[in-house]
């Protein structure tokens, strides 16, 4: 009988080899679990980091949208909302005014909102505006605008590009992401119809002498009120009552 080598077990295997086999086995199991997880992933799971996705359903769910309009087109009061959804300076102003008006007066059919993308920079358009417009073509423009506003901190940490906007689009329930991407990519092409529409929105702001801050143009049976410089909810509500 040959003597047992101290570097081997009685069965002839090396201890180190056993550990290698165990580690490889564990890695294979982990890989298999990962593949199964990806294949069974529910739609939207990869977008868990998007802030406000659940809120969009509560605020905007069931409210009619058509292009830039949110609410009933026969609503007696119309509010043109001039906003730069990329501007972190006026994040709170947007969140303090739009959701309350939507959940109360827009949902009840008393008010309709029209979204006007208004850049607070030297450029007439911004990349997020194209994301809003692409979503609006499916009737989800307001959800996209809301998510852009809610996720401005994340946009500042990461690069605000098509990939980031695609993440926001993926968090909007029932919106066709493939169609959104096609519309977005077509829209950002120079000279596109979407670009012309955004330029027209900027021209309208200039025509109405909207200053470099969020504004509301409130129109109703009793006239029009123009609210400048990031008006709060109280000022907006007062204007609604004035023109109603």
List each model region and its residues.
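Conserved strand-loop elements at the edges of beta-sheets that form or border functional pockets
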Residues: 72, 81, 229-230
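A short beta-strand-turn-helix
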Residues: 60-77
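C-terminal cap of thioredoxin/glutaredoxin-like
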Residues: 1-40, 170-244
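Structural alpha/beta surface segment adjacent to cysteine/selenocysteine redox centers
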Residues: 75, 80-170
């Amino acid at each position: 009988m040959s003597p047992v080598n101290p570097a081997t077990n009685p069965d002839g295997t090396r201890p180190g080899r056993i550990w290698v086999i165990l580690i490889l086995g564990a890695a294979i199991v982990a890989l298999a679990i990962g593949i199964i997880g990806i294949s069974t992933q529910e739609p939207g799971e990869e977008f868990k980091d998007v802030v406000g996705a659940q809120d969009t359903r509560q605020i905007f769910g069931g409210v009619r949208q058509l292009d830039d309009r949110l609410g009933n087109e026969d609503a007696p009061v119309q509010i043109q909302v001039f906003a730069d959804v990329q501007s972190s300076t006026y994040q709170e102003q947007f969140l303090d005014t739009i959701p309350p008006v939507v959940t109360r007066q827009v949902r009840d059919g008393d008010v309709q909102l029209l979204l006007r993308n208004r850049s607070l920079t030297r450029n007439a358009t911004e990349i997020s505006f194209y994301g809003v417009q692409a979503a609006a073509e499916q009737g989800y423009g307001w959800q996209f605008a809301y998510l852009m506003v809610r996720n401005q901190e994340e946009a500042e940490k990461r690069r605000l590009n098509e990939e980031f906007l695609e993440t926001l689009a993926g968090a909007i329930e029932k919106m066709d992401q493939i169609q959104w991407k096609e519309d977005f990519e077509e829209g950002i092409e120079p000279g596109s119809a979407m670009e012309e529409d955004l330029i027209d929105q900027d021209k309208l702001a200039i025509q109405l002498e909207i200053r470099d801050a969020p504004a509301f143009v409130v129109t109703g049976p009793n006239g029009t009120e123009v609210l400048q410089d990031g008006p709060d909810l109280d000022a907006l509500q007062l204007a609604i009552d004035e023109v109603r």
